Every structure is written in structure tokens, then in C-alpha cells.
Amino acid sequence: MKKGCVLLAVIISLGVLPGCSSRAPELSEIYDRVVELVEASYELNEIFYGDGLPYYGRNLEIYAPMYSDYTTEGYTRDYNIVSDLAKYHSVDEIKMAAERVYSQALLEEVVYPSAFTGLLISGAASGTQYVNARYVESEDDFYIYAGEDQTLTSPTPLIYDYATMEIVRPSNGERVLLRMTAWEEDAPDSPTTVKLTLTLSEDGVWLLDSLTV
């Protein structure tokens, strides 16, 4: 009996009892990280679902020659060349920025298909609709889709009230569910309650596992 008590004490001291390693963090441990991630997500949401990166207009005579030798086969009609003044100049650069904020799983399953590949959307009323990739590369050029049928337009950005942030169940040491008050940028008098999910990466870094739009 005595040996059993000693063994139990050792196990407790090592923190290896079932469930010990999955304890949800305290809000104070992740608060600053959540604020950092949400603030960084605004830029990414604009790139993926908003106006996107700046591009050269076809109606400007100075840029017309740039469109005369389009080589992006199958994409040329509604794609414009991303401006040299843009913050990002390739798919890889956008991905590097996105993967510092959003989880790999969320990006690969939800964001990247519409951003870089294109996808089919099925609807009962409209049937199957193809959504063009938002960004494509061809040789040394980087393009953004600018067609009138672009359907992935972001709603008005949400403003989060970080003071209302709280951890809710089910949460653990690798996945945290958060709840806080937010409102659309142009409707501060109409707050709502939203939920965000954090996930711990293999490198031990907290990332958003849900979109902030």
C-alpha cells in the first residue's frame, strides 16, 4: 500500500495522470496571442475575400502593353496583373503570411482551394457554379481575378471586443474554443456573440482554426 502511494505521488509530480496534459490554458496565457492573430487576420481576409491585392488597370494606357503578352492559359480574360506596389508578389508569399495566422488544416480545406485552385459550388437554385481561383501565377507574372462574377466577397469586417473574451467548453491544451462580442464595422450598435477556435500547431504555436469573417 505504501509503495502504491509513493508511485502515485511520483506520477502526480511528473504530471502524467490522464488528462493532465490536455488542460485548457488560462485566458491570460493566450489573450495577447488571440489579439495578435485576430488583428493580423484582417489583412489576410482582405486578400482572400475582400478587394484583394492592388493590380494594374487595363484601362490605363501606360499598363496596356503588359496585357498584350498574357501567357496565363485559360485565365487571361478576367485576370489582372498584381501591382509591383503590392505587399505580396507570389502565391508562396501569401501562404507564408497566412500560415502564421491560420491553421494548416483550415487553409488547405477552406481557404486555399478558392484562393489558388478554383472550386465547384453546388446550389439547389443555381446548380453547379465554378469559382475561379483568386490568384494564379504564370512564369514571372502574378495575377488576381477581377471578373464580375467574383462571388467570394467578404462581408463588412467584424470588430472584436477583446474585453469580452472567454474560454468555453469543450477546450483543452491543444484546442481552445473562445467566445466574445463582435459587431460589423458599420454597425457598432448591433453587437453579436461569435466563437473562434484556436489550435496548437506541431511547433507549439497557437493559430486560428476558424475564420474571423
Model region roles, listed by residue range:
Residues 16-19:
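C-terminal motif of bacterial Sec signal peptides marking the signal peptidase cleavage site
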Residues 5, 21-23:
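Hydrophobic membrane-targeting and insertion signals
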